[in-house]
Amino acid sequence: MKLTRNWLLVMSSFWMISNANAQFRKYSNEFLNIGAGAKGLAMGGAQTASAGDATAGYWNPAGLTEVKGNPVAAIMHAEYFAGIGKYDYAAMAMPIGDPTIATRTLGLSLIRFAVDDIPNTLFLVDPDGSVNYNNIRSFSSADYAFLLSYAQVIFGDESKTFSFGSNAKIIHRSVGSFAKAWGFGLDAGLQYRSKGFSFGLMAKDITTTFNVWNFNFSDREKEVLYLTKNEIPVQSTELTAPRLFIGAAYSSEISENLAIQGELNLDLTFDGKRNVLFRSNTLSMDPRLGVELGYKKLLYGRLGIFNFQQGLKDGDTTNLKKVWIFQPGLGVGFKLKQVDIDYAFTNLANQSNPLYTHVVSLRFNLKRKEN
């Protein structure tokens, strides 16, 4: 009952912040919303109810209690915007105590997103007004996140389980030598499983994750910023508003060799109206749908859609005609003994002018040594 009361208090904070959204940045720490693992990306990010491997630390930490027996790990690499942005992810989960029961599980996740070789044009123009391209230097922008996860079964038996999980996350962001930030936040999740059905709830940034930015400019850089009428920042705090994911999934065996799983997630934000399928001044809701077809638990095909948005129709010179667009996901998976190889083919733009990304990830079953 104490856990239930605490969870209700957490949920109430989502509605309280709707009256103070001026303090928050709508798109803060967006690198933490890219995803984890090619399986989840191929299914449109619909993983809140079904995640049950090392990637559950990202999608819903309550799902880590599904890791039984051996520790598991996952790694992923992806490149976005023709290789300009590089995204890396690694995670590990390990049962505590009796590994066959796994009522408690610990997880670790590392996330990095970076863009290198960004031109620094602060000194492009010499004092005499001439353009000197030799003055251009380059710098990198990198974002890091470290997630420590804990999950525990609240109650359960052979037919059903109800689990709770949480994340403590540390964030570090840097932009060349000019700006650096440290941040901290908490996530919490619930997951219920029973006879093919599963339900999940994931609350991200429940304590309004914060980043404290510090800026470091040389006297010469400050002079250029001043003369070009740019603001010279000293320190700032960036807040990320809470976000709620609700998911429901169902899995069934079609035949002796075929199985299917479908999941629907609702991504709820409380920081004002967003360009999503359902929106209001207080609440915005973006659906995510994913389907997986498995053959002999060895070969998998996956399909997903998410990120519904309304945009201007291509070729419309009046900028008045709007169409609904979405991001599709497509992927396959192979199981080879203790390793799962997953691939996803995703779209980062609208349907008529797509930016495609190929994502490959691996999941490992770290078999324990026998005595």
Positions of the model-derived regions?
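Subset of outer-membrane beta-barrel
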Residues: 23-371
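Bacterial Sec-dependent N-terminal signal peptides
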Residues: 1-26, 291
